[in-house]
Structure formats: structure tokens, C-alpha cells
């Protein structure tokens, strides 16, 4: 079927796990409330996973629910480990990161991107395909 998997992941890199949650966590959850209002939580669940019954379809949507499923929010080391896990489990070929969320301060977003480019990406330099390809 192909050589690997391409994924989009929400990303916020900070000096500590707590800082990532504090500076971007609630903004991410608020954004996902809007997205999941239409799509539900199914895109964030593992195959075969069943959630407990709740009154509202988004009652379980919080930072902890999202973080363990598809967020690259945390220290550079945490993000590196999560990317390695995705590569190992899914034969990850391409990773695209969504790095700005409504409400996150510009300077916090820029620091996160800087940490990602300076501390995370170098760990995957052998995997980078820098060839420019013509799209027809």
C-alpha cells in the first residue's frame, strides 16, 4: 500500500511538561472542543477503544484525554520519544506538526517552534528528505 504513514500532530514544545500544559494546553482543548463538536471523539480513540457513557458527547474531552492520544506537547525529550514511538509502531514516513492554536501567545508559539527546530529535529536528521520534488 505504500512505504509508510503520514500524520499530522498538534505540537507545543516547552522546557517542562507543566509549562507546555500551562501555556498551550487549555487553548488546545478549547480548539478541539470546536473541532470535536462536529466530529466527536472518534478520531482521537484507539482502535477498539470504548469510552464510558456520559451525558454530553464531549464530557471526556480534556488535556489528559488528548495528550496521551495525539499531542506532541512537552519537553524536547518527550517529543523526541513520542516521534520515535510513532516511527517504530507505524512506519512513520512523514510528520506534519500543527504548532499554533487560538489563544496561545505569539512569543510562546515562537519559542516552541524554536525548541522543536533546535532540540527535536536534529535527532531525526538522518531521516530528513531534503530533495525538492516537482508536483504536477
What residue ranges belong to the model's regions?
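An alpha-helical appendage that flanks or caps ligand/catalytic pockets
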Residues: 1-92, 125-136
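Short amphipathic alpha-helical segments at helix-loop
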Residues: 64-67, 101, 105
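Conserved residues at the C-terminal ends of beta-strands
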Residues: 98
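Flexible loop/turn segments at secondary-structure boundaries
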Residues: 14-16, 103-106
Amino acid at each position: 500500500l505504500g512505504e509508510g504513514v503520514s500524520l499530522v500532530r498538534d505540537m507545543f514544545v516547552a522546557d517542562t511538561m507543566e509549562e507546555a500544559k500551562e501555556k498551550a494546553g487549555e487553548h488546545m482543548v478549547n480548539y478541539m472542543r470546536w473541532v470535536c463538536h462536529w466530529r466527536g471523539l472518534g478520531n482521537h480513540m484507539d482502535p477498539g477503544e470504548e469510552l464510558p457513557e456520559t451525558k454530553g458527547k464531549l464530557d471526556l474531552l480534556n488535556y489528559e484525554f488528548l495528550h496521551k492520544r495525539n499531542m506532541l506537547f512537552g519537553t524536547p525529550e518527550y517529543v523526541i520519544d513520542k516521534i520515535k514511538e510513532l516511527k517504530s509502531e507505524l512506519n512513520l514516513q512523514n510528520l506534519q506538526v500543527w504548532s499554533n492554536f487560538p489563544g496561545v501567545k505569539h512569543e510562546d508559539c515562537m519559542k516552541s517552534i524554536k525548541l522543536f527546530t533546535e532540540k527535536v529535529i536534529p535527532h531525526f536528521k538522518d531521516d530528513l528528505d531534503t530533495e525538492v520534488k516537482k508536483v504536477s
